[in-house]
Amino acid sequence: MATQALVSSSSICSSAEAARKIVVGRRQIQSNSKKTSFVVRATSTPPVKQGANRPLWFASKQSLSYLDGSLPGDFGFDPLGLSDPEGTGGFIEPRWLAYGEIINGRFAMLGAAGAIAPEILGKAGLIPAETALPWFQTGVIPPAGTYNYWADNYTLFVLELALMGFAEHRRFQDWAKPGSMGKQYFLGLEKGLGGSGEPAYPGGPFFNPLGFGKDEKSLKELKLKEVKNGRLAMLAVLGYFIQGLVTGVGPYQNLLDHLADPVNNNVLTSLKFH
């Protein structure tokens, strides 16, 4: 009896030890499973790119690989691949193209307003008729108009080239080395030309006298608005060119003619699609 009791006790202990090992093993498996599952979920989460939450305009997988929304007005639209570093071999940098778009947009906004302003002011009788000319009659090649400025139009043209060339040269220097214009002597105006570190947005008392964009959020909104208006202005200037070639009059006169007789003065009738 004693022997049987000893065997039974040993058997019970062995069974208990085996059960304990099974329970511990299951807990380890469950723990490892949880760890493995967590690691898989973590590595499968895609990184969040800057500007990811944005509207996309005919964006492709390739364009989104280099247009990440960090630039103002970037909606992934690049059907020709102009900003693609792989397509150009790194010759054209997306930021350089964006910088060029901003500069050309600013010129276009000035040009769109300046091309139509003399017509409007002339019609209102605020400037002499000899200066209220359509934009295409004020160029130096060929000379046209009967305005009387302090110098002839050829002299004005050469002077404009010299001044614009100087300004563009300094602008390019600031792009190559941001802030460098604030270190070069320029008639005591260096402090106002130091820039903000972003060549496209120099800021300061000369380029931002009203202090727009004091915080990051408002500055981002203003950058986007500027790009949109610049793009619209570039299209407007293109429209001025086409209108001038087709109708032979300025854009303001085109508008007046259309308002006076919309049926006979519109895009279709001007292009003879009737």
Predicted region positions:
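Alpha-helical transmembrane segments and their helix-helix packing motifs
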Residues: 2-274
